Amino acid sequence: MIAVQPMKEEDQAQLSLLMMELTGTQTDATVFGRTFRKILEDQQYILLGAYHNGELAGTAMGIVCMDLTGDCRPFMVVENVVVSANHRKLGIGRQLMLAMEEQAKERNCYYVILVSGKQRVEAHRLYESLGYRDEGAEGFRKHF
């Protein structure tokens, strides 16, 4: 059985392993812990975990952003959607995204936006099956 719920401090070690699976790099444990706690405390962040038989199998992070256009309703940016390789093909990514969309609706967001690497073809199929589409916008990123 899969349970999707907000993450807690005791999930830190398992989440660190998931993030390493996503990026291929290990984050300094002290920095990771400090940032993790800040995210948990910030009401504009939603950090969800998907648990399969009590084990953290996936995660997604949403950030609610204010907007100054139209009705000034907020929107949500979704980042760091990852399902462990050991738990794929169980519908976990879909459940995480649907739960994140519910969080966005509860916060009166008028849309959800996400960026996904071109190589993540399977993830793109999931997003498209959930109604996400390419609106002709280009994503740009600058690293510092």
Regions found by a protein language model. Give the residues of each.
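A short beta-loop-alpha structural element at the N-terminal edge
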Residues: 1-15
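Helix-loop element at the rim of GNAT/NAT acetyltransferase active sites that forms part
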Residues: 17-30
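Active-site rim helix/loop that mediates acceptor-substrate recognition in acyltransferases
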Residues: 27-47
